[in-house]
């Protein structure tokens, strides 16, 4: 079995890391370069940066952040938020990102997934899906969780894989920022149907929550933010817990 990955997520707004609940009520969580270096030292397997301001001006700031981080941190960096074109992807990959994450742009232009995979390799293309439970299923939302896309999340994940996505970053809007656990029904429903890795996101409050997403939710990796940003747990503590529960994890850089 491949090692399960623990991935801190850094939402960046105006060059600062922030965290909210269900995508709103943002509060400051620190300097992105300092936090990234700390997580690298603690044993993070990867880092995800999401530019939640995503204006043209801020994208330049994001590229600068990625460039600084890539000099300090020697694990894969995935960067997303407002990427709309091959040129946007190229800017961040040249700045030092290893992967790019696309969300709203992939929904409005699914062929962007294929074009990105063809140009950079599918291992570079992460399709982020923000899903909200509706009835007996889950609907895809875009524009930072504000706009219903009229797509079933499971069907969209299957299509994204077929188009060339190398990974799915799956966020439960219902669970995001609440620290009460991931939506493992959603995680399992999508993980069980795909041949590419699924990163579970939204809801981590304890090491047990991460374990459940990897075990019950069948995710390949877990994304977490506030439990690390505010010092509730270190990455090393979480990974030791996962190892104690029998999951394969990498324990040192």
Swiss-Prot record:
Molecular function in Gene Ontology: imidazoleglycerol-phosphate synthase activity; lyase activity
Residues forming the catalytic site: 11, 130
E.C. no: 4.3.2.10
InterPro entries: Aldolase_TIM, His_biosynth, HisF, IGPS_HisA/HisF, RibuloseP-bd_barrel
GO CC terms: cytoplasm
Pathway, per record: Amino-acid biosynthesis; L-histidine biosynthesis; L-histidine from 5-phospho-alpha-D-ribose 1-diphosphate: step 5/9
Catalysis: reaction(s): 5-[(5-phospho-1-deoxy-D-ribulos-1-ylimino)methylamino]-1-(5-phospho-beta-D-ribosyl)imidazole-4-carboxamide + L-glutamine = D-erythro-1-(imidazol-4-yl)glycerol 3-phosphate + 5-amino-1-(5-phospho-beta-D-ribosyl)imidazole-4-carboxamide + L-glutamate + H(+)
GO biological process entries: L-histidine biosynthetic process
Keywords annotated in UniProt: Amino-acid biosynthesis, Cytoplasm, Histidine biosynthesis, Lyase
Pfam families (UniProt xref): His_biosynth (PF00977)
Superkingdom field: Bacteria
Location in or out of the cell: Cytoplasm
Homology family: Belongs to the HisA/HisF family.
Quaternary data: Heterodimer of HisH and HisF.
Function as written in the Swiss-Prot or TrEMBL entry: IGPS catalyzes the conversion of PRFAR and glutamine to IGP, AICAR and glutamate. The HisF subunit catalyzes the cyclization activity that produces IGP and AICAR from PRFAR using the ammonia provided by the HisH subunit.
Protein name: Imidazole glycerol phosphate synthase subunit HisF
Species this protein is from: Dehalococcoides mccartyi (strain ATCC BAA-2266 / KCTC 15142 / 195) (Dehalococcoides ethenogenes (strain 195))
Gene: hisF
């Amino acid at each position: 079995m491949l090692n399960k990955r623990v991935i801190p997520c850094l939402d960046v707004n105006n060059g600062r890391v922030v965290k909210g609940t269900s995508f709103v009520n943002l509060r400051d969580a620190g300097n992105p370069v300092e936090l990234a270096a700390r997580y690298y030292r603690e044993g993070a397997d990867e880092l995800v940066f999401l530019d939640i301001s995503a204006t043209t001006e801020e994208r330049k700031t994001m590229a600068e952040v990625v460039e600084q981080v890539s000099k300090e941190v020697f694990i894969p960096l995935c960067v997303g938020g407002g990427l709309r074109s091959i040129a946007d992807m190229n800017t961040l990959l040249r700045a030092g990102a290893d992967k790019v994450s696309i969300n709203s742009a992939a929904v409005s232009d699914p062929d962007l997934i294929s074009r990105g995979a063809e140009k950079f390799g599918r291992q570079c293309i992460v399709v982020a899906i923000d899903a909200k439970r509706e009835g007996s299923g889950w609907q895809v939302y875009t524009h930072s969780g504000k706009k219903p896309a009229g797509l079933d999340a499971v069907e969209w994940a299957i299509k994204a894989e077929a188009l060339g996505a190398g990974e799915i970053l799956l966020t439960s809007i219902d669970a995001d920022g609440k620290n009460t656990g991931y939506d493992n029904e959603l995680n399992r429903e999508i993980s069980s149907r795909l041949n590419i890795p699924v990163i579970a996101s939204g809801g981590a409050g304890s090491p047990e929550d991460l374990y459940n997403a990897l075990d019950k939710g069948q995710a390949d990796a877990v994304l977490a933010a506030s439990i690390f940003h505010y010092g509730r747990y270190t990455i090393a503590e979480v990974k030791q817990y996962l190892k104690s529960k029998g999951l394969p994890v990498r324990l040192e850089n």
